[in-house]
Amino acid sequence: LMRNQIVLTGATGFVGGAILDRLQREKKYPVTAVVRGDSSLRASVVPVIRIGSFDGDTQWQGNLDEADVVIHSAARVHVMNDVESDPLAAFRKVNVEGTLNLARQAAASGVRRFIFVSSIKVNGEGTTPGTAYTADDIPAPADPYGISKMEAEEGLREVAAQTSMEVVIVRPVLVYGPGVKANFLNMMRWLSKGIPLPFGAIHNRRSLVAGSSSAPSAGISRVTSPLTSAKAP
């Protein structure tokens, strides 16, 4: 039986939604979206898998049997004014334990490729002037979110080494566009109110990617390519 289905987590999120839009436009493979609780997809008509929570105890039995590729973009992201007593533990519960639980069950179900949407935060918060991050840099995350993504990457490499499932890890930079939230949205609001921002006095550069093009940066091009011999980046 030929397996050609893509299972996408985080489809209601900003980046996950952009990935879903891209996959629907390409119409190369059937897509099933994973959503939590009563969340709804924005103007998308695809089969949906509903889960109550996403952590190390989530049961995926039967939901991955037809999947050839899992694209995992669901995550606990930056929380403004986080009230968790232990933010790192909260991030680990979803981003590490939830990710590795999904990956192990995906491998056991016969999924051939697992694409993990990580974050440039794994690399750190800044480089020396005139240099850019590379995939070979030593990870230096500086906050709980980045640490959790790094630990998930490390665990996924172990899963790749222990199973026949290929793991692809992508670290997107800041993604912007319609529906963006957090600090980027705050800056847009300040600008709309005419509040000047001191960019001219700051000698700094930061890479950005438009939401409309974030799907390729999240590894979608790897979905349609032949399986490679490398199981981790």
Residue spans for each PLM region:
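N-terminal Rossmann NAD(P)H-binding glycine-rich loop of SDR-like oxidoreductase domains
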Residues: 4-26
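Active-site Tyr-X1-5-Lys
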Residues: 140-168
